[in-house]
Amino acid sequence: MSNYVLALDQGTTSSRAILFTREGDIKQISQKEFTQIYPQPGWVEHNANEIFDTQSWVMRECLQEAGIGAADVVAAGITNQRETTVVWDKATGAPVYNAIVWQDRRTAGFCDELKARGLADVFRKKTGLVLDAYFSGTKVRWILDNVPGARAKAEKGELLFGTIDTWLIWNLTKGKAHVTDSSNASRTLMFNINTGAWDDELLGILDVPRSMLPRVTGSSEVVGDIHPEFLGKAIPIAGNAGDQQAATYGNACLKPGMAKNTYGTGCFMLMNTGTEVRSSQNNLLSTVAWTTPSGRFYALEGSVFIAGAVVQWLRDGLGIIKAAPEVEQLALSVPDNGGVYLVPAFAGLGAPHWDQYARGTMVGITRGATKAHIARAALESIALQTLDIMDCMQKDSGIKLAALRADGGATRNNLLMQFQADVLGVPVERPKVTETTALGAAYLAGLATGFWKSEDEIATMWQLDRRFEPNMSDDKRQHLVYEWQRAVERAKAWVEA
């Protein structure tokens, strides 16, 4: 009898494989980082072959280290950095260009052109998204227009497009499956979330041939098998969801009104809105959460581009810490931020501002400011950006959040979690298994193959590690928020278009 589900978690900085038990506990984790490529300011790329090579390597290592064979694995689930775009040759499988990463800003000018043509509402109504360089559609167009010969080949049906899930599945199945799920498709600017299908009008505006696009499947169904060459035996690929949707599922936010925030490279808050699309009036995104036998579920999403990455910047850019975990003790060495506010708009501002021309800004610096104040301001910026999103989410949904479930690497930072509860004014719940992105992919795969019987069973498996209760006066909270909002205004529109 197979006792495990394998999750392949392909992230922005590393590829990981995690084995989960029937109880939803972690048996083994394997991780490998890969190269970040910055060809020009504002451009971010990955080598698509390196992504697949690292992912297949950790998949093998994970099973070897756990001392189990492929026969012990009932199914595999995939979750991935979303929006990152790969275009490859259908015949050879070779990418025609590096993967263009979700953080990449090179298509900002084209997004402005589309807005000037009055098309923002067309895209918002059909896709739930804003016209921003973040999403895949404009990246595909850039590749077709800037890689010699790419457009001609695409129009002959010789090129394929995929987000990272599609690229992994294509390679794992040896080219047998060119598929994506509805959650990933909903991040492309080419998918109509109301009809659940690619949209010809949007494809026409973006000038992307339909023949390039993958077939859209559910998030919890068998779409193909990992070829026996990789692990010695075929394993069904039975779950697929973009990383933030998978984390929402892994946090068991299965009922409308439940919300989670993932603290990773960026910060991503999603609220389950049920089987109806809830349009945002406050610059949030409406997105597909997942499609399961229970139906197509939607979410409101607020995306913060820079969260944990601000701590990496303290380490790599400023050199004020040697390792990321040191930031908590450094920040705790001062009682407050000393009036220093850091707006980490290194790649523009995401929700709810959507300012591609904002840049990182630090204000309130005096001679008394120290590296500890900067460290504290950096951590606080993560929580304050999250507050901006929660305020909008509550207005759009009409739901007062009862608690926020938190996951991702930065949730290990107790100072950040407590400050988050303080500024939100609601409890923050950290689960025992914080690898909820991978867990969500595992749940979706296990559900499709009968490893877990129902979503009710999955909901009962979620376990609390620690609940952080708000402990800040209203006056102090209001002052922090007021100063933060002043700092954000100073970061906006810094780059002159």
Curated annotation (Swiss-Prot):
InterPro entries: ATPase_NBD, Carb_kinase_FGGY, Carb_kinase_FGGY_CS, FGGY_C, FGGY_N, Glycerol_kin. ATP binds at T12, T13, S14, T265, G308, Q312, G409. ADP binds at T12, R16, T265, G308, G409, N413. Key enzyme in the regulation of glycerol uptake and metabolism. Catalyzes the phosphorylation of glycerol to yield sn-glycerol 3-phosphate. The lineage of its organism: Bacteria, Pseudomonadati, Thermodesulfobacteriota, Desulfovibrionia, Desulfovibrionales. The keyword ATP-binding applies. Inhibited by fructose 1,6-bisphosphate (FBP). The keyword Transport does not apply. This is Glycerol kinase.
